[in-house]
Amino acid sequence: MSQDYRSITELPDSLLNTEQLMRLSHRYLLGARLVTAKRVLEVACGAGAGLGLLAQSVQQLVAADYSLSVLQMAQAHYTRRYPLVCGDASWLPFPAAAFDVICCFEALYYLPDYNHFLRESRRILTSGGTLLLSVSNPDWRYFVPGLLTTHYPTAPALAQSLLNAGFTDLQLFGILPSSAASPLTRLRHHLRRWVLQANPSIATGVFAQTLKRLLYSRLLPMPAELTPHAAAAMGGEVKMTPLPLDRPDTVHRVLYVLCSAGSSAEACEANP
């Protein structure tokens, strides 16, 4: 890949609406519950807003991102607290069985072929290690694809890809159901979808901030590092609904998948 993702990356001091901050906080609160005394890798870490939360109880934390300029922002904030690696998620520069947990949040659909990343994740995870993914749901009724994205997997397609890559014990969850949204929130979703379908380029830069102000009015700056207190206040009450793996979900805006790396023998059977 040679794409520059800085324009679509949430950076420190970017203005976010409350739902964006909630999603950001929730994903790292969830990740933090899985990483105690583990060797952890976050892939597509961006500017590293969640690294402090993940690092509270880990044995080791490494973060990787494709964009050097974005990774340098994380480096400027964290200095040498954690190893930061610039690399391609499709070809991860780590030895086999190097990590116990891998987290990748809302990034699969920027990859030319996310199956390469899944196979690489299986390779560098220990047997029984954990992969935690979050993805925007393409079957959600207000879904609009983002700029620079390639392919959004549906829940069944992602589940099958994970099985093919050698993962087991798959669990699928949804958050932010449209059925629970207020009439005003649903109106905002309709307007956002209409505007972005008419002009996708408005999703970046000054246009994006203007759109957010028009739709949401109250915007807050993204922190360089989420604190436990702030994250709990913004994302601690999110309900995760278990979902079936074999059919699309049209209700939830975001999907989470939690799964385990199968044994080497199982991985070979999945990829004969």
Kindly give the residue locations of the regions a language model identified.
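Acceptor-substrate binding/catalytic loop of class I
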Residues: Y142-S161, S179
